Amino acid sequence: MTHEEILSMLGDYVDYLIANSSAEAPMWNIEKVRSGKPNKWNYIDGCMITACLSLYHTTGDKKYLDFSKQFIDYFVQPDGSIQTYDPKEYNLDNVNQGKNLFVLYDLYGEKKYRKAIDLIRSQLETQPRTKEGNFWHKDIYPWQVWLDGTYMAQPFYMEYETRFNKMQGCIDSYKQFMNIRRHMRDPKTGLYYHGYDESRAMYWADPETGCSPNFWLRAMGWFMVAMVDVLERMDEQLYNEYRGIQAMLKQTIEDVHKFQDEETGMFWQVMDHPGVEGNYLETSGTALFAYAVLKGVRLGLLPKRMAAWAEKAFYGTCDKYLSKNPDGSLQLDGICLVAGLGGKDHRDGSLAYYFSEPVVCNDAKGVGPLVLAYTEMIAR
């Protein structure tokens, strides 16, 4: 396919997904589809709605905004409560969808959105923390910091503090990133481990460092986008903190780029084990890299020379995994459905574990980031 054909196909693909989805039955939430349970407020839908709102801002096509509002309004009640959301669950994943409420509040001015934003912010007020001050990823994972959580919570936190709280929590957010850098970055590769257990109690945690054993691509992807999204929302008056996260972002992109597959432009599910049996070129993490770099370049956070790395990742992913079915429908393959640490399934962070999780098509954890990268491509 030519680049023009790929961009055209992606536009059709998003239209196909939203035409066949609703808040009750989002076809892109494969975990929900497989469970057969009613839909809940969740980060997966949040990724897709973020992508739809970005498409609206880029194209001006109101169908993306209308769909997003209808979807969110299914959950956000007139009094600002959020159906199925419980702040006391203390799950950072549930904060992610809150970013979209700022957009709808700005566009429509409805008080229920501001109340819902405040409700989600109340979770962070009492979210358990490590002794050094980082949010626990979830209440059910005590003393643990996961890279994923930076994307799920920090952009929302930074936007709230900047807009509504006189920047009181902005330094706190910055310090959480610095703690992650100190504990979770591998000095040899520059990559970051998926998880960190301050207590060193979990079976997956290194007894010395507290880190999990491997570099999972999507976790790195979430982390890269988190830095870009936080900087987008951060006031540059916080000069040292702003420059600190920006320098960390640039260094991370430089280090990650070294693991980009020369032939396809993609990245491997476990990043530093290319070609190992069971490993594969993975869509969601590659798309997150492309999006983080393209957006970082557009915002002036990253040097322009890096855009070529992102384009290679973007088109490489589409060439390998975006296809048209005989019935004319489109699908995006190569998406790791889920990966975590601990829990009832004894997820130990080993290579065998990361290779064992299902690989699916059309899940928003891959589709959302690819569409976000697509919006950056067409906005140039």
Residue ranges of model-derived segments:
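Alpha-helical scaffold segments in carbohydrate-active enzymes
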Residues: D12, Y16, S54, Y74, ...
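Inter-helical turn/loop segments and adjacent helix faces that build the functional surface
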Residues: T59, Y108, Y160-I171, V230-R243, ...
